[in-house]
Regions:
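Acidic/His- and Gly-rich active-site-bordering loop/insert found
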Residues: 20-128, 133-155
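Structural recognition of the beta-strand scaffold that forms the well-ordered cores
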Residues: 38, 70, 89-93, 128, ...
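Histidine/acidic-residue-rich, glycine-tolerant segments that coordinate divalent metal ions
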Residues: 79, 116-127, 133-134, 145-146, ...
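Sec/Tat-exported extracytoplasmic proteins
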Residues: 26, 30, 38, 42-45, ...
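Metal-dependent amide/peptide-bond hydrolase catalytic core
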Residues: 64, 242-349
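N-terminal secretory signal peptides that target proteins for export/translocation
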Residues: 1-2
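Bacterial N-terminal signal peptides
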Residues: 5-16
Length: 349
C-alpha cells in the first residue's frame, strides 16, 4: 500500500509522460530509500504536539531533496519551499502525529514506542494507527521526484508537515504562527488520506465533502453517591449516563434527513471506583461528525437538550443538571474545489 500511496502526490504535478517511466522511477526510489524511511517512521511514532524527532527527520529529508526548510512553525511543524520559475504557489500537506495505541500486529516494523502523553502525563504506547507514516513518506517521495524533474514543471512548491492533527491543534497553530504571511497563501492546496477500505493503487477524489467536520464533546453527569446496597439514597450517574447514551442514538436516526449524513458516537464512559459504591459523577466523551453547519447545530443542540432533560427526568435540581462541554478542538468539513477536482481527474485518467 505504501508504494502506491507514494505515487499519489508525485503524479499530481507530472506533465504528460509515460506512466511506466513514472512508476519505474517511484519504484526505484521506494526500493532504495522510501521503503526503509517508511519502516523508520512506523517504528518510531510520536504523539500530537511532541513530534520532535519526526519533524527533525522530515526537515532533514526535505532539505536533502533541495528545499528551503523552516522548522518550528506552529510548534513542531515544518514548511519546505522550492521556487522554480513563474507559476502558481501549490501547497502539499501531510500530517505526522501518531496515536496512543499499542500495536499488536506482530509485523517486523511494528511500533513498540512509548512516550509521555502530554495530556495525562502517563507513559503510553504509541502507534501510527491512522496512516500518517504513509502520508509523510509520500511527501518525501514527492519532494524527491519534483526536485529531480524541475524541467517538467514551473511555479513554487510548498510542502507542509503538520503536527497535532489528531488533536485538531496543528493547523490552527501553524495559522496562528502566520504561515500564510511568512510563506505565501497557496493558489492550490492538496492533501490526501489513505483508506484501509479502499483498493490499493486506486486514487479516489470527489467534488463536495469527502470528509466530515468533527466536534469533540464532553458530558459531565453530577449524581449523588450512595452505597450499592442503598441505591434509593443516591442519584446513580451510571444509570443516568446509560439513558443519555441510548437517547443520543435517536439524533441521527430520527432528527436528521436520511440524505443528511451525521454521526454521534460515545467513545468513552467513565464512572465509579468500586463494586459496591454508587459514584457521584460520570464522564462521557463523544465525537460528532457532520457535512454541513446546519446538521452540526442540530446534533449539538440535541446533545444539550437530551443531557439536560434526562437529568430533569432523574430528578436532579437545575444547578446539578449534566454539563455539556463543546471543545474548541473542532474542524469544519473538507469541501473540495470542484474545478480542481475535475482537473485532477482529467490528469489521472
Amino acid at each position: 500500500m505504501i508504494k502506491r500511496a507514494i505515487c499519489l502526490l508525485a503524479v499530481l504535478f507530472s506533465l504528460p509522460a509515460f506512466a511506466s517511466e513514472l512508476n519505474e522511477s517511484i519504484q526505484t526510489d521506494y526500493d532504495e530509500h522510501l521503503g526503509a524511511l517508511f519502516d523508520h517512521f512506523h517504528r518510531n511514532p510520536e504523539l500530537s504536539t511532541v513530534e520532535t524527532e519526526t519533524a527533525r527527520r522530515m526537515a532533514l529529508e526535505l532539505s536533502l531533496a533541495g528545499f528551503d526548510v523552516t522548522e518550528g512553525v506552529g510548534g513542531t511543524g515544518v514548511v519546505a519551499m522550492m521556487e522554480n520559475g513563474e507559476g502558481p504557489l501549490v501547497m502539499m500537506r501531510a500530517d505526522m502525529d501518531g496515536l496512543p495505541v499499542e500495536e499488536k500486529s506482530g509485523l517486523a516494523n511494528a511500533s513498540r514506542a512509548k512516550q509521555k502523553d502530554p495530556i495525562t502525563g502517563n507513559d503510553v504506547f504509541v502507534m501510527h494507527a491512522c496512516g500518517h507514516d504513509v502520508h509523510i513518506t509520500s511527501l518525501v517521495g514527492t519532494a524527491r521526484h519534483m526536485a529531480a524533474h524541475r524541467d517538467e514543471w514551473t511555479g513554487t512548491l510548498m510542502l507542509v508537515v503538520q503536527p497535532a492533527e489528531e488533536r485538531v491543534l496543528g493547523a490552527r497553530a501553524m495559522r496562528d504562527d502566520e504561515i500564510w504571511e511568512r510563506f505565501g497563501k497557496p493558489d492550490y492546496a492538496l492533501a490526501f488520506h489513505v483508506a484501509s477500505s479502499g483498493t490499493a493503487g486506486v486514487i479516489n477524489v470527489q467534488e463536495g465533502s469527502p470528509y466530515a467536520g468533527a466536534d469533540t464533546v464532553d458530558i459531565i453527569i453530577h449524581g449523588v453517591g450512595a452505597h450499592g446496597a442503598s441505591p434509593h439514597r443516591g442519584k446513580d450517574p451510571i444509570v443516568l449516563g446509560s439513558q443519555i447514551v441510548l437517547a443520543l442514538q435517536t439524533l441521527v436516526s430520527r432528527e436528521l434527513s436520511p440524505r443528511d449524513p451525521g454521526v454521534v458516537t460515545v467513545g468513552s464512559f467513565h464512572s465509579g471506583t468500586k463494586h459496591n459504591i454508587i459514584s457521584d459523577r460520570a464522564h462521557l466523551q463523544l465525537t460528532v461528525r457532520n457535512t454541513s453547519e446546519a446538521t452540526r447545530q442540530i446534533l449539538l443542540d440535541g446533545i444539550v437538550r437530551i443531557a439536560e432533560n434526562m437529568g430533569r427526568v432523574a430528578g436532579l435540581p437545575e444547578d446539578k443538571l449534566p454539563e455539556v462541554i463543546i471543545s474548541n478542538e473542532s474542524v469544519p468539513p473538507v469541501v473540495n474545489d470542484a474545478p480542481l477536482v475535475r482537473r485532477l481527474r482529467a490528469a489521472w485518467v
